[in-house]
Amino acid sequence: KANAFLSDMVDRPIRWMVDDAAKFTAREVRRGRRYDGIFLDPPKFGRGPNGEVWRLEEHLPAMIADCRALLDDKSKFLVLTAYAIRMSALAIGELLNQAMADLGGTVEVGEMAVREEARGLLLPTAIFARWSRS
């Protein structure tokens, strides 16, 4: 929500979700919902209350497919960030390229970093892949 404030978007219709992302996206697909854009920040690993296990490398393709089903020809973006994983930005970008091929647009990938104050070194923090409408 701080990002919405910093981006001067507090008055925009942003729907904030704090839920199991895989269950939420599957539910929204069943309901036939569509979104203008999606920010996706899944964990590397998670365990549900009933012993369910989430592993990013294993479950991300299905989650991206569900997210694709929530977008249509009016949708603007899908942004995915991932931390401390065995997949590269290139691999995640290819997953997005395949999932979003029918919508056109472009996929960009890269690393996120913070600059160390003392020596000015860039310290990697995560990778990202972003699909956007051309």
Model-inferred region functions:
Residues 75-134:
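C-terminal catalytic and target-recognition region of SAM-dependent MTase-like enzymes
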Residues 27-29, 49-51, 90-91:
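Short, well-ordered secondary-structure micro-motifs
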Residues 1-39:
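S-adenosyl-L-methionine
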Residues 18-19, 35-66:
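Mobile active-site "lid"/loop adjacent to the S-adenosyl-L-methionine
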Residues 2, 23, 62-69:
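Alpha-helical scaffolding segments of alpha/beta enzyme cores, especially the outer helices
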Residues 22, 43, 84:
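Catalytic metal-binding/acid-base residues of hydrolase active sites
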Residues 66, 71-78:
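Short glycine-dipeptide loop
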